Amino acid sequence: MAQANRRSAQAWGQGSEEVNGWRQGLSEPSAPCSVHVVTAENKGFYRRGLEESFRLRHQYFSVENDFLPSQSSGRETDEYDADDAIYFLAFEDHSERLVGSVRLLPTVRKMPLKEYVDLAGGYDVPRAPTTFHFSRMVVVRDRREGKPLNFVRASLRCAVLEYCLDEDIDLLTLMMPMAMLPTFLAHGWNPVPLALPEVYRGLSIVVATVDVTEVALKLTREEAGIACNLLIKRSITRPAITTKPYPMRLS
C-alpha cells in the first residue's frame, strides 16, 4: 500500500518532497479512493490532476450532456476557477487514476447562482463567509455505477463534509437535478429548495441549500460503506474562511 501511495504522489505531484507530504496525510488502508483538497496554496502539486479534472468536466457537462457550451480547448473552466476556488480530486488508490472531482466557491463574492436568476425563482440566495457554493461534481463514466449515488460521488460528498466540518463551513448552496433531492434528504443533508424546479437544457433543476452536519457525514458514509476519512490535505495552512462571519444577501 505504501509503495502504491508513493507512486501516486510521484504521478500527481512534483517529486520526493511531495511524497513525504502525501505519506503524512494518507487515508486509512481500507479506503478504495482518496480525495485530495486543492487550493491556491498547494495547487502546484496537483497541476496534472487539475488539468484532468477540467477535461473530465468538459467531457461530462459539454460532450455527454450538453449542459454547458463546448470549449475548443477540450477543457471546461470558467471565471470562478480562480485562486479562491477549492477543488476536491478523487483518485483510485490502486490505479492512481483521477475518477472524480467537485468544486467549492466562497459566496461572499460574485458566484454562479447569480447567473441563474430564473432558477432561483426570485428568492434570496444565502451568502455568508460560512456558506460555500458546491458545484461541478463529475465522475468518470466507468465509475458511475450505483446511480443515483455511486461510490465515487459518495466519496466526494463525504470529503466535502469532512473539509467543511473542519473549516466551520455550515451551509452549502447548489443547483441539483430534482432526481438527486431524495438522496440528499435520505442522507441527512436537509435540502431546502429556494424555488420550484425549472427546466434547464432539458433537465429539471432546483436551487437549494444543504446543511453541513456530522449526521449527514455519518449517513452518507453508511450508505456507501465508507468506514474511514477519505480527505487528504497537504501543505495547506490557510483557513477557508478568511472573513468575519455575518449574513449577506445577493444584491
Where are these regions (language model features)?
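Acyl-donor binding region in acyl/amide transferases
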Residues: P112, V117-V210, E214
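A short beta-turn/loop motif at secondary-structure boundaries
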Residues: T77-A82, E198-G202
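Short, His- and charge-rich active-site/binding loops that engage polyanionic ligands
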Residues: E92-V125
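A short helix-loop-beta-strand connector motif used in the catalytic cores of GNAT acetyltransferases and
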Residues: D78-L89, R109-P112
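Short amphipathic alpha-helix that is part of the acyltransferase structural core
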Residues: G25-E79, H94, L98
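Short acidic N-proximal helix/loop "leader" segments that mark the beginning
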Residues: M1-S34
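Active-site beta-strand termini and strand-to-loop segments that position acidic
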Residues: A90-D93, V210
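Charge-rich, low-complexity intrinsically disordered segments
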Residues: R136, L203-S251
